[in-house]
Amino acid sequence: GSDQAGSGLENGSQGESDSGRAPDHDTVGAVASDGERFAAATSTGGRSFALAGRVGDVPQVGSGFFCTEAGGASATGAGEDIARVTLSRRAVEHLDDGIGAQAAADRAIEEFEEITGSGAGVIVLGEEGAGSAFNTDGMQTSIAYK
């Protein structure tokens, strides 16, 4: 149950505001595994003053979330740039290439920043563990093991 998961919680929070979260941001991402398959999800509160009809990065497969048999990822940040480079897909492709989750997250964010110059964060879960990376203030991450 949740008591077991909570007992294995690792908090990787960095760049938090005094309230424990970044002001005016409420995106939540999750990646999970049942031991055989991976699933990823990302939810966002949207963007103020967006153009009518804009489709953000969150609902786009490969951008806000992505999974293969090797693992999954969820990302948030500069939405148009995340969509342009399909950040979550990029992170999972690194897992497919055989590198670990933390290295996949680090490499994906390094490539993202090099290509776009923008800020983002990504969480990654693979068969060997979890990782996260970001290049912007206000990203909080936690890992729960059952």
Model region roles, listed by residue range:
Residues G1-K146:
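N-terminal nucleophile
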